[in-house]
A protein has these predicted regions:
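Nucleotide-activated donor-binding/catalytic signature segment of Leloir-type glycosyltransferases, i.e.
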Residues: 40-60
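Acidic donor-binding loop of glycosyltransferase active sites
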Residues: 64-78, 91
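A short, well-ordered alpha-helix in the C-terminal region of glycosyltransferases
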Residues: 128, 135-149
Length: 170
């Protein structure tokens, strides 16, 4: 069972937290897709496979193989594209409790949250994910349902235009 990280390899992506968590919990393996100045920090780690920049077909292939997506971000992001893609592909997300990540990831339903910057807390979540693969699969199903409910136009346009109609009447 392995996880997946997709993003820019920069300090604010939380790669230091991820690498430290991997040291604390030696059972985890993570595939990393992305490039950037923090690449050297994780390049030699024995349980991190670095793929660099890849095309969308390779991203989707890695998502199909992964048990979860990990987003150890240290910065307040709106809605990271990797989260949306993970949800669309039925992949639960283990994310830092920061910004919109804390709103979109519902612990025990579509993923798990850990305290931003805490390698120890992330290591605990990775260990839990490895210990309960069936629950993670169920969370992936919920993540896919959340994608349909929150991000697809055919679900959201009626809500948006209904609100606009109501606002126009006021």
């Amino acid at each position: 069972m392995s996880g997946l990280f997709i993003g820019r390899l920069v300090i604010e992506s939380g790669l230091g937290t991820l690498a430290e968590a991997m040291d604390l919990y030696p059972g985890a393996r993570i595939d990393v897709i992305g490039a950037g100045p923090e690449e050297a920090r994780i390049a030699g780690h024995p349980r991190i496979r670095l793929f660099g920049r890849v095309g969308q077909s390779e991203v989707l292939a890695r998502m199909r193989e992964a048990a979860y997506l990990v987003l150890p971000s240290l910065s307040y992001e709106d809605v990271p594209r990797p989260l949306v893609e993970a949800f669309a592909n039925g992949l639960p997300v283990i994310a830092a409790r920061i910004g919109r990540l804390a709103e979109l990831v519902e612990p025990g339903r579509n993923g798990l949250l850990f305290e931003a910057g805490s390698a120890r807390d992330l290591a605990r979540r990775l260990a839990w994910a490895e210990a309960f693969p069936e629950k993670m699969r169920q969370m992936g199903e919920c993540a896919k349902a959340d994608y349909r409910a929150r991000f697809l136009a055919d679900w959201n346009y009626p809500i948006l235009f209904g609100e606009r109609r109501r606002a126009a009447r006021v």
